[in-house]
UniProtKB/Swiss-Prot annotation:
Protein name: Putative toxin MJ0605
Origin superkingdom: Archaea
Statement: the UniProt record of this protein carries the keyword Ligase: no
Organism per entry: Methanocaldococcus jannaschii (strain ATCC 43067 / DSM 2661 / JAL-1 / JCM 10045 / NBRC 100440) (Methanococcus jannaschii)
Pfam families reported in the protein's UniProt record: HEPN
Length: 134
């Protein structure tokens, strides 16, 4: 089903996807330079911004991270439109980003590599969903 969205919302969705792609590119560069803490954060923000883009298709615009995660689960995963793995990815990435930003625990190379891979999967899945909706 195609969403009836005004031009401003469509432009905001496109801008969020561009931000997600930039964050994903930055995560890869940071990873290559062994800056795992920042790589994890950028990978999370790639997921976060792409999830926000999808939420806008339902005129939902939560301001907080927890709201994005909750609404993504309620309106897309629980409804069966997006596979459950993506609900797990957004939650896992949030928790890892929180650990990276607010504790002295440094993410491992494996954690950073895994979350970047999952962020790429997530962004690709959201872009596919947006093509179907828009």
């Amino acid at each position: 089903m195609k969403a009836l969205l005004n031009k401003d919302i469509r432009e905001e969705i496109q801008a969020l996807i561009e931000i997600a792609e930039e964050n994903l590119s930055a995560a890869k560069i940071l990873f290559e330079n062994k800056l795992y803490r920042d790589a994890v954060a950028r990978a999370y923000y790639a997921i976060f911004h792409s999830a926000k883009a999808l939420l806008l298709t339902k005129n939902l615009n939560p301001k907080k991270h927890a709201g994005v995660i909750k609404m993504f689960g309620l309106y897309f995963v629980n409804e069966g439109y997006i596979e459950e793995i993506y609900g797990r990815i957004i939650t896992k990435s949030y928790n890892l980003r929180w650990k990276a930003d607010y504790t002295t625990d440094k993410p491992t190379e494996e954690e950073a590599e895994s979350i970047i891979y999952e962020a790429e999967m997530f962004v690709d899945r959201i872009k596919k969903a947006l093509k179907e909706i828009l």
